C-alpha cells in the first residue's frame, strides 16, 4: 500500500465538472435519498414515456431489481438520434485499424445510417424484439453498428470476445438460444488473421448437436480471406445493407426490457449470462462516463478495451455515445508494429482521455521509456485504468512518464455485473493514492465484512459487499435467477457480494486486494478456475486437475495448473505444450496456462475436498506456513508438490 498522496492538480480542479464539495453533497443525497437523487439524474437520457417510479429493489428473498420501471426509452435513440439536430456532423467514432496507416472517421449522421441499415437487415431476416443475436466480431465499426442495431429494434445482443474458441462461442450460443450470428470473414490482430467465420461455422455445428440451430449468419468482409460458405444461411453484410433503407424507427422499450447478455466467468464451470436492461444501465453508463472521465464536449476519448468485454460495452459504445462523445475504437494491439503504438495513436488523433488496463501498462513499462518519450502526448488530460488493481510502481510510471506528472490517474473498480464504475476517484474532487480505487461513486454503498459476515468499521481488511442497489446493476443470470441469488446474495444475506477482497484505510480509501473466490483475474480478464480445470480434464491423458492463480509480473495473475495423469503416463515437456494448446483450443488464448506441474496426487481432505489454500501457497513459492494440514488424507502429497514446484525463486 502506497502512502503517497497526489493532490488534485490546480488546472484540473479549475475546469472539473465535480469538485470536492459537490462530490460530498451529491454522494450524501445519493445514499440518503436515492429516489430523489436518481429521479433527477435519470432525466439525463431522453424518455418517450417519462418514469414516475424510480427505485424498486430488494436484495432479500427472490431478489428483484427495477429502476425507472414505468418509463419507456430506446438506447440507440439516445446514443444517436437525439444528437443529430445539433451535432450530426460531429465525429462519433474514430476507427484506428490494426495497420497504422488505416483509419476512418464516422460522424453521428453516418452512424445513424449504418445502424438503421443494419437494423433493417436484421428485421428483414426475421429478428424481432426479445430475440437473442450473437455478435462475434473484431474491433471494427460494424461491431458497434451491430450492438446499436439490436438495441434499436429491441433484440438482445450477446457479444462474444473474438479471442474465444469455437467451443466457448458455441456454449454462449446454446445458453441464450441465439439463432442469428453476426461475424466477419477474419479479424486482424498484430498483423495476423483470426479465423472468425471458420470459428463461427465450427461453433454452429457444436450448437446444433445441442439442439440450438442458427438460421442466419451475417458476415462482414474485413480481410477478403477465404472462408466456408453455407448458401441460404450465410449473408454478406455489404450485399444485404445495399437492399434496405437508411431509416428505421427506434422501438419503444420499457426501462426493464433486456438490452444485452454478456457472459462472465464464475467460480463454477459454466459461464454466467449477465443480463443488463435498458433504462437504468444507460443512465448509469452515461453518468459514470461523464463524471469519472470529467468528459467535456469536444474531448477525444479512447478506451483500449474490446467490445467483447463489459468495458467495451459501457465505455467504448454506450456511455460515450449517449454523451455525444467522440470515441476511438482500436483494432490493434499495444505492441504492433512496435511498443510505441499507443502513444503514436494518442498523438495522431489528439486523444485527451486515455483508459487502459494495468497489464498493458506493465508490459509497456517493461519496454522502456523511449517508446513513450519519442511521442508528445501533449493532448492528454486524463489517464484511466480498468480490469484489475494497479500496483503502485506501474501507477507511478503511468503518471510520471506517460502523463508527464500532469494527468490524474483514474483507477476504476467495477465489474461486468455492476454495469459501470463503482469505486473510483473523480478527477476534480478526489486526491489520489497510487494503487487505490479511492472512494465510491454516487449511489454506491460499500461495506466490508469478515468471513462470518460481521460488519467491519473504520480501517479494515475484509470482503467487499454493496448494501443497496444502483441503476447499472445486473438484473439476473440469463435463464437462471436462482443462480443469481445463490452467487451474489446468499453469502452475506441482504448484501451484494462482489467476490473481491478489499482494504479500507484510515482516510476511507478503498484498496482492492483481488478475488476471494475461485476466479482468476488474468490481464484484467476474469477466468473461472473451474473452466480451466474442466478444459484440462477433457484431455484423454488427464485424470484430475486443480488450477490456482499466482503473482505474475505482467498479467497480474498467472495460471498455475496441477495435473494428475492417467495411470501409466509420464509428464513431459511435450505433454505440457500439448496441454497448453488443448486449453487454448477449448477456451481461447487468454486461458493459456503459465505453469503446469505434473503431480501424482493432490492435497485432499478425507472427504475428498481439494485444499486449494495449500496449492496457492506452493504456486506462490511460499510454503513456510501452510497452516493446518492434519485433515489431509495423505500429507506426503504436499512434500512431493513442494519438491517439484514450477515456480522456484531463482537463486
Swiss-Prot record:
PROSITE patterns: AMP_BINDING. Acetylated. Deacetylation by the SIR2-homolog deacetylase activates the enzyme. One of its GO terms (cellular component) is cytosol. It catalyses: acetate + ATP + CoA = acetyl-CoA + AMP + diphosphate. GO terms for biological process: acetyl-CoA biosynthetic process from acetate. GO terms for molecular function: acetate-CoA ligase activity; AMP binding; ATP binding; metal ion binding. InterPro entries: Ac_CoA_lig (IPR011904), ACAS_N (IPR032387), AMP-bd_C (IPR025110), AMP-bd_C_sf (IPR045851), AMP-binding_CS (IPR020845), AMP-dep_synth/lig_dom (IPR000873), ANL_N_sf (IPR042099). Keywords: Acetylation, ATP-binding, Ligase, Magnesium, Metal-binding, Nucleotide-binding. Pfam families: ACAS_N, AMP-binding, AMP-binding_C. Mg(2+) binds at residues 537, 539, 542. Its cofactor is Mg(2+). CoA binds at residues 189-192, 311, 335, 523, 584. Its EC number is 6.2.1.1. The modification N6-acetyllysine is found at residue 609. ATP binds at residues 387-389, 411-416, 500, 515, 526. NCBIfam families: Ac_CoA_lig_AcsA, PRK00174.1. Catalyzes the conversion of acetate into acetyl-CoA (AcCoA), an essential intermediate at the junction of anabolic and catabolic pathways. AcsA undergoes a two-step reaction. In the first half reaction, AcsA combines acetate with ATP to form acetyl-adenylate (AcAMP) intermediate. In the second half reaction, it can then transfer the acetyl group from AcAMP to the sulfhydryl group of CoA, forming the product AcCoA. Belongs to the ATP-dependent AMP-binding enzyme family. This is Acetyl-coenzyme A synthetase. It comes from Rhizobium etli (strain CIAT 652). The lineage of its organism: Bacteria, Pseudomonadati, Pseudomonadota, Alphaproteobacteria, Hyphomicrobiales. The gene is acsA.
Amino acid at each position: 500500500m502506497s502512502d503517497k498522496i497526489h493532490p488534485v492538480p490546480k488546472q484540473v480542479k479549475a475546469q472539473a465538472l465535480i469538485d470536492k464539495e459537490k462530490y460530498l453533497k451529491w454522494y450524501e443525497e445519493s445514499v440518503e435519498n436515492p429516489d430523489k437523487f436518481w429521479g433527477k439524474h435519470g432525466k439525463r437520457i431522453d424518455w418517450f414515456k417519462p418514469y414516475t417510479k424510480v427505485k424498486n429493489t430488494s436484495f432479500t428473498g427472490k431478489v428483484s431489481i427495477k429502476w425507472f420501471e414505468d418509463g419507456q426509452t430506446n438506447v440507440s435513440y439516445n446514443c444517436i438520434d437525439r444528437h443529430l439536430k445539433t451535432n450530426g456532423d460531429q465525429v462519433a467514432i474514430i476507427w484506428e485499424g490494426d495497420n497504422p496507416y488505416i483509419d476512418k472517421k464516422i460522424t453521428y449522421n453516418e452512424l445513424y445510417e449504418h445502424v438503421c441499415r443494419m437494423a433493417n437487415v436484421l428485421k428483414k431476416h426475421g429478428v424481432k424484439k426479445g430475440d437473442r443475436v450473437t455478435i462475434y466480431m473484431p474491433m471494427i465499426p460494424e461491431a458497434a453498428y451491430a450492438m446499436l442495431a439490436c438495441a434499436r429494434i429491441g433484440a438482445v445482443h450477446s457479444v462474444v470476445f473474438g479471442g474465444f474458441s469455437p467451443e466457448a462461442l458455441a456454449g454462449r450460443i446454446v445458453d441464450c438460444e441465439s439463432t442469428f450470428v453476426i461475424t466477419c470473414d477474419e479479424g486482424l490482430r498484430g498483423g495476423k488473421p483470426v479465423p472468425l467465420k471458420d470459428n463461427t461455422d465450427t461453433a454452429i455445428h457444436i450448437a446444433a448437436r445441442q439442439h440450438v440451430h442458427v438460421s442466419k449468419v451475417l458476415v462482414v468482409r474485413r480481410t477478403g480471406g477465404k472462408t466456408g460458405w453455407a448458401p441460404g444461411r450465410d449473408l454478406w453484410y455489404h450485399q444485404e445493407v445495399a437492399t434496405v433503407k437508411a431509416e428505421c424507427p427506434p422501438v419503444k422499450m420499457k426501462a426493464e426490457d433486456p438490452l444485452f447478455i454478456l457472459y462472465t466467468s464464475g467460480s463454477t464451470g459454466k459461464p454466467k449470462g449477465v443480463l443488463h436492461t435498458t433504462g437504468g444501465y444507460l443512465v448509469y453508463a452515461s453518468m459514470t462516463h461523464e463524471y469519472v472521465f470529467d468528459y467535456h464536449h469536444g474531448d477525444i476519448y479512447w478506451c483500449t478495451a474490446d467490445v467483447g468485454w463489459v468495458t467495451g460495452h459501457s465505455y467504448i459504445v454506450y456511455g460515450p455515445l449517449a454523451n455525444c462523445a467522440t470515441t476511438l475504437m482500436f483494432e490493434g494491439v499495444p505492441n504492433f508494429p512496435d511498443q510505441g503504438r499507443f502513444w503514436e495513436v494518442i498523438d495522431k488523433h489528439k486523444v485527451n482521455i486515455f483508459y487502459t488496463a494495468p497489464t498493458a501498462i506493465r508490459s509497456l513499462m517493461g519496454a522502456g521509456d523511449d517508446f513513450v518519450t519519442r511521442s508528445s502526448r501533449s493532448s492528454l488530460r486524463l489517464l484511466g485504468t480498468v480490469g484489475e488493481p494497479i500496483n503502485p510502481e506501474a501507477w507511478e510510471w503511468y503518471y510520471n512518464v506517460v502523463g508527464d506528472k500532469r494527468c490524474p490517474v483514474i483507477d476504476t473498480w467495477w465489474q461486468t455485473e455492476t454495469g459501470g464504475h463503482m469505486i473510483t476517484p473523480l478527477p476534480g474532487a478526489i486526491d489520489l493514492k497510487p494503487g487505490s480505487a479511492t472512494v465510491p461513486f454516487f449511489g454506491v454503498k460499500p461495506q466490508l465484512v469478515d468471513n462470518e459476515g460481521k460488519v467491519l468499521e473504520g480501517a479494515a481488511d475484509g470482503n467487499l459487499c454493496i448494501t443497496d442497489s444502483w441503476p447499472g446493476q445486473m438484473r439476473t443470470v440469463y435463464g437462471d435467477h436462482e443462480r443469481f441469488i445463490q452467487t451474489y446474495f446468499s453469502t452475506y444475506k441482504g448484501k451484494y457480494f462482489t467476490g473481491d477482497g478489499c482494504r479500507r484505510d484510515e482516510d476511507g480509501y478503498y484498496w482492492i486486494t483481488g478475488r476471494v473466490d475461485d476466479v482468476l483475474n488474468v490481464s484484467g480478464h476474469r477466468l473461472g478456475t473451474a473452466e480451466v480445470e474442466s478444459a484440462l480434464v477433457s484431455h484423454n491423458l488427464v485424470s484430475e486437475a486443480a488450477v490456482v492463480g499466482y503473482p505474475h509480473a505482467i498479467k497480474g495473475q498467472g495460471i498455475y495448473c496441477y495435473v494428475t495423469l492417467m495411470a501409466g503416463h509420464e509428464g513431459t515437456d511435450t505433454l505440457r505444450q500439448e496441454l497448453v494448446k488443448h486449453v487454448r483450443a477449448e477456451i481461447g488464448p487468454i486461458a493459456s496456462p503459465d505453469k503446469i506441474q505434473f503431480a501424482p496426487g493432490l492435497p485432499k481432505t478425507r472427504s475428498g475436498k481439494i485444499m486449494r489454500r495449500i496449492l496457492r501457497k506452493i504456486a506462490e513459492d511460499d510454503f513456510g506456513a501452510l497452516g493446518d494440514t492434519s485433515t489431509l488424507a495423505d500429507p506426503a502429497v504436499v512434500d512431493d508438490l513442494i519438491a517439484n514446484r514450477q515456480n522456484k525463486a531463482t537463486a
